[in-house]
Amino acid sequence: MRLEVGNIFIKDIQFGDSTKVENGVLYVNKQELISELSSDEHIKSIDMEIVRPGESVRIAPVKDVIEPRVKVEGNGGIFPGFLSKVDTVGEGKTNVLKGAAVVTTGKVVGFQEGIIDMTGPGADYTPFSKTCNVVIIAEPVDGLKQHDHEAALRMVGLKAGKYLGEAGRNITPDEVKVYETKPIFESVKEYPNLPKVAYVYMLQTQGLLHDTYVYGVDAKKIIPTLIYPTEVMDGAILSGNCVSACDKNPTYVHMNNPVIHDLYELHGKEYNFVGVIITNENVYLADKERSSNWTAKMAEYLGLDGVIISEEGFGNPDTDLIMNCKKITKKGIKTVILTDEYAGRDGASQSLADADAAADACVTGGNANMTIVLPKLDKIIGHVSKDVIDVIAGGFDGSLRADGSIEVEIQAITGATSEVGFNKMTAKTY
């Protein structure tokens, strides 16, 4: 598959009479977009605001972040299985409004969602303080059940992303990047002397609103399978998660997964990047055994020399991570794991809930238990009150202070300890 990704650089977003891109500015017809999103009977009200990097704004709680994209040429459309037919995507041309994002907020399910600060110390921990954001405030009807609530918020974000993406359909991109992965036998024939590597992409599927979707299918119900890396760039994988914000992969991160982008950088030079194995993180032991067995079997079947394995979430999925690592290593395949840590606020506790000697090459996204004080900001979008902040994942009794500042673990900040490296955290040895 060969995909041309055309980046249209967005330097500002403003409301206007029509939705269009002009001279690097995305103009949004607010009422038209609200009308587009208001058809869901589960949503009581829709409003939206525009926020920009450096503004004294706090968004909380955050459900998802979506990048506006549009399929210009090629099979299918963006978000197959949800907003487009279930066609195989990942080839042709896709235009991206780079620098723009849709952020969904409102009364969010379970209040395990995150915080995005557009300025101050918290802004350094979230990549979405650097994007111009259309924030969708979606309030549910009274008495809505949790799963219906999550689905409604998810669809609002996806629809907004698709609507805004259409503004880039007929725009000449500022930059075009080409990504290509050939069928396995062609690829091996082209690079016979290069080591074969793949990416084992673990998806959050613990259930109870910890869900990820692949072509519209709940990933709990899949067995590990192989996909082209470019399929991910067209929205084949998307987030349905209400889970700790620091290390869940928002839909935006799936579409821009840096592991995939970085593996392409040296493809055909230092190694042969043959594809992506997607697998899940179900909670029952039998499911974990099945999925890790299939993942290792597939890695062996492809004749791989090495894999990178990324986790999503923590705790229960640590077992899936170590199972995958151990079983793939046992096949004689080199492994590197990507994770983050819950090592206590002093960093002295065990970082993962599971471990094995096979996991001897590890990249960490940081310690999610580290605490930070977020100063009071001038404007709040969403819900920031004691009954929200004190129970957010990473919060505690007394997190919201009387002066409006918030003391939380960085676990509460969207994308702070990204396990695919979509952040600025690193580790150093002294």
Curated annotation (Swiss-Prot):
Modified residues (Pyruvic acid (Cys)): 242
Domain of life according to the entry: Bacteria
Anything else known: The protein sequence in PubMed:11422384 comes from protein overexpressed and processed in E.coli.
Cystine connections: none
Organism this protein belongs to: Acetoanaerobium sticklandii (strain ATCC 12662 / DSM 519 / JCM 1433 / CCUG 9281 / NCIMB 10654 / HF) (Clostridium sticklandii)
GO MF, any single term: glycine reductase activity
Record bears the keyword Cytoplasm: no
Function: In the first step of glycine reductase, the substrate is bound to component PB via a Schiff base intermediate. Then the PB-activated substrate is nucleophilically attacked by the selenol anion of component PA to transform it to a carboxymethylated selenoether and the respective amine. By action of component PC, acetyl phosphate is formed, leaving component PA in its oxidized state. Finally component PA becomes reduced by the thioredoxin system to start a new catalytic cycle of reductive deamination.
Assigned EC number: 1.21.4.2
Catalytic activity: acetyl phosphate + [thioredoxin]-disulfide + NH4(+) + H2O = [thioredoxin]-dithiol + glycine + phosphate + H(+)
Keyword presence, Oxidoreductase: yes
Record's subunit section: Heterohexamer of two alpha, two beta and two gamma subunits. Component of the glycine reductase complex, together with components A and C. PB is substrate specific.
PTM field: The peptide chain is cleaved into beta and alpha chains, and the alpha chain N-terminal cysteine is deaminated and oxidized to form a reactive pyruvoyl group.
Protein's name according to its UniProt entry: Glycine reductase complex component B subunits alpha and beta
Active-site residues, record numbering mapped to chain: 242
InterPro entries in the cross-refs: Gly/sarc/bet_Rdtase_B_asu/bsu, Gly_reductase_pB_sua/b
Keywords: Oxidoreductase, Pyruvate
One Pfam family linked to the record: Gly_reductase
Gene encoding the protein: grdE
